[in-house]
């Protein structure tokens, strides 16, 4: 998992993701992401090996989850 934007690049591992459900992803504390940070407006597009691939809608997102893509 990787998040990239103009000022931030954060790599996420399986252990970084606590849960993914009902359009919400819950992160453990890491780098600049807040503890138990919730990233709303996720759309689950596929799931493989227990890891979901998601993409964010373009509205109502905190700065730390803009352009976040799971792959």
Curated annotation (Swiss-Prot):
Entry keywords, A to Z: Sensory transduction
Tissue expression: Adrenal, cerebral cortex, heart, liver, lung, pituitary and testis.
Record family assignment: Belongs to the arrestin family.
Protein's recorded name: Arrestin-D
């Amino acid at each position: 998992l990787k998040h990239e934007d103009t000022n931030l690049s954060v790599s996420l591992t399986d252990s970084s993701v606590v849960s993914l459900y009902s359009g919400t992803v819950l992160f453990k504390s890491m780098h600049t992401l807040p503890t138990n940070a919730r990233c709303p407006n996720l759309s689950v597009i596929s799931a493989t090996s227990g890891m979901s691939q998601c993409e964010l809608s373009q509205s109502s997102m905190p700065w730390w989850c803009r352009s976040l893509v799971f792959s």
